[in-house]
Amino acid sequence: MAGHSKWANIKHRKAAQDAQRGKIFTKLIRELVTAAKIGGGDVSANPRLRSAVDKALSNNMTRDTINRAIERGVGGGDDTNMETKIYEGYGPGGTAVMVECLSDNANRTISQVRPSFTKCGGNLGTEGSVGYLFSKKGLILIASGDEDALTEAAIEAGADDIQPQEDGSFEVYTAWEDLGSVRDGIEAAGFKIQEAEVTMIPSTTVELDAETAPKLLDLINRLEDCDDVQNVYHNGEISDEVAALL
């Protein structure tokens, strides 16, 4: 995972995401309902649900809305028949792309996902074609703090790895099941958590140039525009120099 900055590579997408907040809320509620259905409504015992709640709160969703979604999931309402489906493929520049979807109609979902790859010079692969390049991890972002103190607190809490970033922030990696407990330990030590989520971390990355990077971003945007797509993971690496040209 050395050198990989997942957060740096998504900053440029924040504005586009904010512009479609209604769609984001729909996806967040869908994830809350599904997480509660699968793992129960106790946030402390359900890492997926806690991650979904944290993400919803960071997008300014109200507690009432979150609680209603959880109640629907636990109660088994009409909208809880969603299933998680992962699609794998190759994007511009040979990048590996994983698309996490929640859907009650696989045919509808694939009819949205496949053309996105095709239009951007990529292709949808078979199950397992790129999945082996990713590991499911918990990822915590700390905006600033004393490195030694954070390292001690994170290790004590059960973190796997702590990586300082050039801007003074820190990325803390955990087993995905331990995300909540590690987060609690770091917060108890006095550090402010900027973001925390369960994500997919690539074992290797592909450096993208100024010609290829926009094509990958176009693919990501097209996929995230699909109603059934919850998350898009990739192993493309965009340097600060290339990002400045976009």
UniProtKB/Swiss-Prot annotation:
The keyword Transcription regulation applies. One of its GO terms (cellular component) is cytosol. Belongs to the TACO1 family. Gene3D superfamilies: 1.10.10.200, 3.30.70.980. It is found in: Cytoplasm. PANTHER family: TRANSCRIPTIONAL REGULATORY PROTEIN YEBC-RELATED, TRANSLATIONAL ACTIVATOR OF CYTOCHROME C OXIDASE 1. Its main location: cytoplasm. Keywords: Cytoplasm, DNA-binding, Transcription, Transcription regulation. GO terms for molecular function: DNA binding. Pfam families: TACO1_YebC_N (PF20772), Transcrip_reg (PF01709). This is Probable transcriptional regulatory protein APJL_1171. The keyword Phosphoprotein does not apply. InterPro entries: Integrase-like_N, TACO1_YebC-like_2nd/3rd_dom, TACO1_YebC_N, Transcrip_reg_TACO1-like, Transcrip_reg_TACO1-like_dom3, YebC-like. GO terms for biological process: regulation of DNA-templated transcription.
